[in-house]
Regions:
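Conserved beta-strand positions in repeat-built beta-propeller and related beta-rich domains
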Residues: 1, 53, 60-64, 98-103, ...
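A structural motif specific to WD40 beta-propellers
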Residues: 15, 77, 177-178
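Short loop/turn segments that connect beta-strands within beta-propeller blades
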Residues: 8-11, 71-75, 110-113, 171-174
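Short coil/turn segments that connect the beta-strands within blades of beta-propeller domains
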Residues: 55-57, 93-95, 154-155
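Beta-rich catalytic cores
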Residues: 44-47, 64, 84-85, 145, ...
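Surface-exposed loop and turn segments in beta-propeller and other repeat-based domains
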Residues: 11-44, 116-142, 181-197
Length: 198
């Protein structure tokens, strides 16, 4: 519903909520109490798919947000524009790292002249290598869909793709160095990745 929920680890309750409202690329944070009966309208215009927090604030991405949004605790602004259909957008070095799910690639784009820009293809499997292709009806993540992303080092990232594959990408070398297919069933897909413990 174009919302972010905050989970309180001490009380084990979702006790903070924020709906992101947009009007012609102007964004507004509308706070609400998720424990009350009064909540936001049930809209899913932005298809929010990830939140990344650091000392600079909260970064929010979605398939239809137009880019990576930044919430500083008061206001929401567009930090950077991105292609439609992106997943897992997050600040990285001096730019942005994200899954360009429509193009089946992991992308890093720096703020410079493009010398550091990277686009590395996710693993591509032939139909004969995958199972349950009959389920690929648009309701599940299609094969080769890039989703799930986390930083390993300042030049290495882990990314997910469908069907259930985790790959390691070396941005310095601009290549995928290893992949592990957990399943070749198209009904199964990676959603998020994180280094543990963190």
């Amino acid at each position: 519903f174009d919302c972010i929920l905050g989970f309180n680890l001490d009380t084990a309750v979702f006790d903070w909520g924020m709906q992101i409202q947009e009007n012609q690329y102007r964004f507004r944070a509308a706070r609400f109490d998720p424990t009350s009966d009064d909540g936001p309208m049930m809209l899913n215009r932005m298809h929010i798919n990830n939140v990344h927090c650091n000392a600079a604030g909260m970064y929010i991405g979605g398939r239809r947000t137009g880019g990576m949004l930044h919430y500083n605790g008061k206001t929401i602004t567009m930090a950077v524009t991105l292609p439609t259909g992106t997943h897992n957008a997050q600040p990285f070095r001096d730019g942005v790292l994200f899954n360009d799910s429509e193009a089946n690639v992991v992308r890093y784009t720096g703020r410079g002249e493009g010398d550091e820009d990277r686009a590395i293809e996710v693993p591509i499997y032939g139909d004969e290598e995958m199972t349950h292709l009959w389920a690929n009806d648009g309701e599940v993540a299609r094969p080769h869909f890039a989703r799930g992303l986390c930083q390993v080092t300042d030049s290495v990232v882990a990314g997910g793709s469908s069907p259930s594959t985790v790959s390691i990408y070396d941005l310095r070398e601009n290549k995928r160095v290893v992949e592990v297919a957990i399943s070749r069933d198209v009904r199964n897909a990676i959603h998020g990745l994180e280094i543990w413990p963190h």
